[in-house]
Every structure is written in structure tokens, then in C-alpha cells.
A protein has these predicted regions:
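A short, polar/charged loop-to-alpha-helix boundary motif
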Residues: 378-394
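Hydrophobic positions on the alpha1 helix immediately C-terminal to the Walker A/P-loop
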Residues: 185
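Flexible phosphate-sensing "switch/lid" loops adjacent to ATP/NTP-binding sites
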Residues: 1-173, 189-351, 355-358, 365-367, ...
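Short clusters of small/polar residues that mark proteolytic maturation junctions
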Residues: 374-375
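The conserved Walker
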Residues: 177-178
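Short HxH-centered metal-ligating active-site micro-motif
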Residues: 392-424
């Protein structure tokens, strides 16, 4: 994989910049932490070299100064809101986050329940946390929020919220997902800190959009693609331009709310420490791009993936909004992209046409070589492409059988005769298990298995929608999957994916 981002430089520069921001205030900074902390795969895809846990590693450099406060909305507890990527409810994700932070040595100070409502589910959640030794605090709904600034910054607003007792200079405010109330918690804490004579500060940590690269840079366009369902729009920060005469990038929600936030700062502290939304941020990622061309190409690929993902969701569930698709089409146009233009797509379609329109797949390896796979009597197309790619990487002739038909056929019998399956062909996970069994007695199979890490970061395209098993396996291998929004049996009404 070509590297476009200096991760070591980022860890050092980002942690130092946060230390400097802490010093600007009364040695107390509330840092609103947006995005994913442990597994930012979007950032790792568009900034090759950025590690999925880079933000966590950066925080670990500050762990002696930092404590974590996790925020969850009472509404999300009551509605049992689910985090899509993990398939667990927000309240359970709070427990998962506590474990994850503590396992790496970060101090979790407390959990704050926002928009507090005296519901049985909320009280049970608080009781459970308290029994585990985790302190909980309550913040309440404020009538007129966020526009009635005079009421919000008063004893009838933030003053009603419980003051979250914290011990360390850096308080990281994070949450299971968006809409939990992280910024409101930060500002409420500033109100209470100033009441106690502590001139604390606030800052916002968001990786995207990157403020010091062009508005229409592919990295920033890829962020818009990632948030197309929210209809976030990157914009030139007009406040920063007016204050400093410098063009920077922010996104619409932060720009729209800035006058309100600024007014709150003035009421809390007497004057605002910031002249623009960009000022509030601490993101240093833009300074660590070392090969712009690599990041541009990676980001263009990400935009295409997001577009395919939207089309597939529309086909499978019908839940993706038309507005989301239109937004992604606009971004495709802005980035000069078209469907079917990538070599991995072209070769997958060519293989399908060469086999009478049967499902086919292609994998683009890190050296640019594209390996294809067809649907056969033993393997599905993606399983075939996977085995062919491993052979190529291991220098094994393509005609070599790494797993014999005699080993595959009993698995097919198990699937169809005993487990009620209708498709005898092996999925990607099944062929990998068969390959691992063969590796015990075959040096060639073992050599192929050892190439699995080299599939990480490779693009794979299927000419039909894949089963959840195949999609999950590609994901676990770190491969970047796209599919045509077409079922293998298009005339059927029910499709098991």
C-alpha cells in the first residue's frame, strides 16, 4: 500500500497541540471528541498510513492528563437506539466503551445522561453503572435550546444540570453516536467551572473535514460522501475569513451554530476565546499528509464505494433516501468519477460476460494487478477470486488446486444434505477454512494462507450482491468491497443475504 499520511508525525503533533490548548485556559480543557476513537476506518481508507486507532494512540500520549466522560441521551436509552456498526444498543455500547478505555489504561471518570427523563429504563441504567463503580450525572432538557441563549446560560438552564466532578486537566467528552449532546455537556461544564472560579476552556476534535486543505479536495469530498445520509455540507468558514482573511473549511452545522455558541461563551466568560468555528478545532491531520496524490486517489475510491453502498442499500432494504443518492451522484461528478471506470469493475464485468453472464468478482492487488474469479461448481465467484489472488501472491501457478475437489465435496454435502442449504458452492469463509485444513499437509496451501495479510486494503468488486457471510469475510480481511446493485436471481421476490 502506498503511504500518503505520516502517522508518527500526526501522533506527536496532535498531542502537543492539545497540550498547548490546555495551557491557554486555566489548565482545564473540555474536548468534544467527534467520530470514532477506536476504529476510524474511514480515515484509514482516505489517508493511507493513518491507523484506525490513531486517535486512541494520540490520547494515550496524554493519558496522565486525561479523563473520559461518556455522554448518552436518555431518549436513546428509552428507545433502545442501536449502533449500526456493532449491532448493540447505545446503553450497552457505553459499557463496551468503558471496558475499551480502561483496558488501554485511560481513566473513565463518569457517565452523563443528557435530556434526562425519569423513566424506568434510565434509572435502571444509572443503577447498573453505579453498581459497577461508575459515577453518573444528569443533564436536563432546556426549553428554547439552542436559541434562547439568555435562558440557557442561567440558573434555569445550565444551572439546573448536575456539575460533573472531574479530576484532570483534559476532559474528553465522547459518546456512542451523534446527537448525544456532547457540545451541550461541554458548555454546561464551562458554566459551572466559571461559577467556581475556574476559567476552563472548550475545544472540538474532528478529523473531517480537514480545515487547511481545499474545500473540493477529494479527502473533504469523501467526508461529504460518508455523511451523505446526514446531508452535511463542507463550506468555507465565513467567520474565519472575516477575522483573519484566511480561507479554511468547516461544515455547515458548526458554521450555522457558531453565533449561538459564541454568544454562550460571552455570557459564560465575559468574552469568547474564539473568532470562528475553525478556531475551536484542534485537528492537525492536514499537516501530516505527505503524499497528496496518494490521498486524493484513495479518497476518490472511497467516494465510489460510498455510492455503491447507497445503491445496494436501496436495492436490499429500500431505506437509503433518494436525496442521499442524489448527493452522492453530485459528489461523483465533482470528483470526476463514473461507475464502472475502475479497472477492478471492468475486469469483473468482463469475466462475467465471458462466462455467460454468471456472477464474477475481481480483486485489485497492491501492485495494480487485477485477479478475477468466476462462479463454478465448487466455489462462488468471490471465493474463487480470493483463492486465485492468494495463488498469485504466493507465486503458485493458477492451475494448481490448493484445496482438492475431494476435500470440498464433503463440505457441499454437509451444507445441502444436513444443514438445509440450497447453494452447494463454498462461500469465502468456507473456502478459507478448507484452505487452512489443507495447509496442515500441503506446503502450497500453507504458503497461500500466509499471503492473507497482503489482501488488506485491496479493492474487490462483485457483479452481484453478496451474502452477509461473504461481505463480512471481506471486511474482516480488511478488503474494500463494492457490489453491483443486482441480485444473482433478479426475478425472485425474497433474497437471503
Amino acid at each position: 500500500m502506498k503511504i500518503g499520511f505520516d502517522n508518527d508525525k500526526y501522533l506527536a503533533m496532535q498531542s502537543e497541540h492539545i497540550r498547548e490548548r490546555i495551557k491557554k485556559f486555566d489548565n482545564k480543557l473540555y474536548l468534544e471528541f467527534g467520530g470514532k476513537l477506536f476504529d476510524d476506518y474511514h480515515a484509514s481508507r482516505v489517508l493511507p498510513g493513518f491507523q484506525p486507532d490513531s486517535k486512541l494512540q494520540m490520547l494515550l500520549q496524554l493519558k496522565e492528563q486525561a479523563e473520559i466522560v461518556i455522554v448518552i441521551s436518555a431518549e436513546d436509552i428509552i428507545s433502545s437506539k442501536v449502533r449500526g456498526d456493532y449491532g448493540i444498543t447505545y446503553d450497552l455500547d457505553v459499557l463496551r466503551l468503558i471496558d475499551a478505555f480502561q483496558e488501554v489504561g485511560l481513566y473513565v471518570g463518569s457517565v452523563c445522561v443528557t435530556k434526562y427523563t425519569a423513566a424506568a429504563e434510565v434509572e435502571a441504567f444509572e443503577k447498573r453503572l453505579n453498581s459497577l463503580g461508575i459515577r453518573t450525572f444528569r443533564h436536563y432538557k432546556i426549553p428554547g435550546y439552542p436559541n434562547d441563549v439568555a435562558r440557557i446560560v442561567s440558573d434555569e438552564g445550565y444551572g439546573r444540570n448536575e456539575y460533573i466532578e472531574t479530576e484532570r486537566p483534559l476532559v474528553v467528552i465522547t459518546a456512542p453516536g451523534p446527537g448525544s449532546g456532547k457540545m451541550a455537556v461541554c458548555l454546561s461544564q464551562l458554566y459551572h467551572e466559571y461559577k467556581r472560579g475556574v476559567k476552563a476552556g472548550y475545544a472540538k476534535f474532528e478529523t473531517f473535514p480537514i480545515w487547511n486543505i481545499p474545500l473540493k479536495h477529494p479527502v473533504n469530498l469523501a467526508y461529504e460522501a460518508a455523511t451523505a445520509d446526514l446531508n452535511d455540507v463542507n463550506m468555507i468558514d465565513p467567520f474565519h475569513l472575516e477575522a483573519y482573511g484566511v480561507t479554511t473549511v468547516n461544515y455547515n452545522r458548526d458554521i450555522e451554530i457558531f453565533p449561538v455558541v459564541n454568544a454562550m461563551f460571552e455570557l459564560i466568560a465575559g468574552q469568547s476565546p474564539y473568532k470562528s468555528p475553525t478556531d475551536m478545532g484542534v485537528n492537525m491531520a492536514g499537516n501530516c499528509i505527505v503524499d497528496d496524490a496518494v490521498c486524493c486517489e484513495a479518497s476518490r475510491k472511497e467516494i465510489v464505494r460510498r455510492y455503491y453502498k447507497c445503491l445496494c442499500e436501496q436495492k436490499i432494504t429500500g431505506t437509503a433516501k433518494e436525496s442521499e443518492r442524489y448527493k452522492l451522484e453530485l459528489l461523483m461528478n465533482q470528483a470526476g468519477l463514473t461507475m464502472g471506470a475502475r479497472e477492478v469493475e471492468k475486469q469483473a464485468h468482463a469475466r462475467s460476460e465471458a462466462t455467460g453472464g454468471a456472477p464474477a468478482a475481481a480483486i485489485e492487488l497492491s501492485d495494480g494487478t487485477v485477479i478475477t474469479g468466476k462462479t463454478g461448481p465448487l466455489l462462488g465467484a468471490t471465493a474463487s477470486a480470493l483463492i486465485n489472488a492468494l495463488k498469485y501472491l504466493a507465486g503458485i501457478p493458477q492451475e494448481t488446486d490448493l484445496v482438492s475437489a475431494a476435500a470440498i465435496e464433503p463440505i457441499q454435502t454437509l451444507k445441502t444434505n444436513y444443514l438445509g442449504g440450497k447453494n452447494p458452492r463454498l462461500h469465502t469463509d468456507e473456502i478459507l477454512i478448507a484452505l487452512s485444513s489443507s495447509a496442515a499437509s500441503s506446503d502450497l496451501a500453507a504458503a497461500a494462507m500466509h499471503q492473507l495479510p497482503n489482501l488488506k486494503g485491496c479493492d474487490v468488486h462483485s457483479t452481484v450482491l453478496l451474502s452477509s457471510v461473504d461481505s463480512s469475510t471481506q471486511n474482516r480481511l480488511g478488503m474494500y468491497l463494492t457490489c453491483d446493485p443486482v441480485y444473482e436471481e433478479e426475478d425472485r421476490k425474497y433474497h437471503k443475504l
